[in-house]
């Protein structure tokens, strides 16, 4: 009987966590409300572990994908197809860089903070990051 109670309690706790998870929408745009071209809106998003983010190609010819080195180690990222909606559930706390591959050089990048992040990991900008993308990412990270 205790085993059944413990199993039921564990299942209830797991389901309760899923019930409180939120879904956030990010638009992929040719022009943002601030006049900037080739943007994600919002450009910075803070979510809780277990939350899902849906990337919506409001304007065509965009995708959303994570970047190796711009997300927590051991996490398998995602790659959305051009002009198609993609959803991803962020289970692991940390910072995530998300880009639009065709417009990365134009600075189409966003940052997602999952849980509480105290500082930008030293490996977050490893590799080649286009100048405009780096500028926008730096501005987004000022939200930490």
In which residue ranges do the predicted regions lie?
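Extracytoplasmic/periplasmic copper-protein system
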Residues: 22-34, 106-144
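Bacterial N-terminal signal peptides
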Residues: 8-16
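Beta-strand cores of secreted/periplasmic/IMS beta-sandwich domains, seen most often
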Residues: 22-25, 41-64, 85-92, 96-99
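Bacterial N-terminal signal peptides that target proteins for export
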Residues: 1-7
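Beta-strand-rich extracellular modules
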Residues: 101-103
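Histidine- and aromatic-enriched segments that form or immediately flank copper-ligand environments
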Residues: 56-81, 110
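Copper-binding active sites and cupredoxin-like electron-transfer domains
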Residues: 48, 61-69, 133, 138-144
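Sec/Tat signal peptide C-region and signal peptidase I cleavage site
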Residues: 17-21
């Amino acid at each position: 009987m205790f085993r059944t109670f413990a199993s039921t309690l564990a299942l209830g706790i797991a389901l309760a966590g899923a019930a409180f998870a939120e879904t956030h929408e990010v638009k992929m745009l040719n022009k943002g409300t601030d006049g900037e071209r080739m943007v994600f809106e919002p450009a910075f998003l803070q979510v809780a572990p277990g939350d899902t983010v849906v990337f919506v190609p409001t304007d065509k010819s965009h995708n959303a994908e994570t970047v190796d080195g711009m997300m927590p180690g051991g996490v398998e990222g995602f790659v959305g197809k051009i002009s198609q909606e993609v959803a991803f559930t962020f289970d692991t706390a940390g910072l995530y860089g998300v880009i639009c591959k065709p417009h990365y050089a134009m600075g189409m990048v966003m940052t997602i903070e999952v849980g509480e992040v105290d500082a930008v990991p030293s490996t977050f900008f490893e590799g080649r990051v286009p100048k405009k993308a780096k500028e926008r990412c730096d501005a987004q990270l000022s939200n930490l």
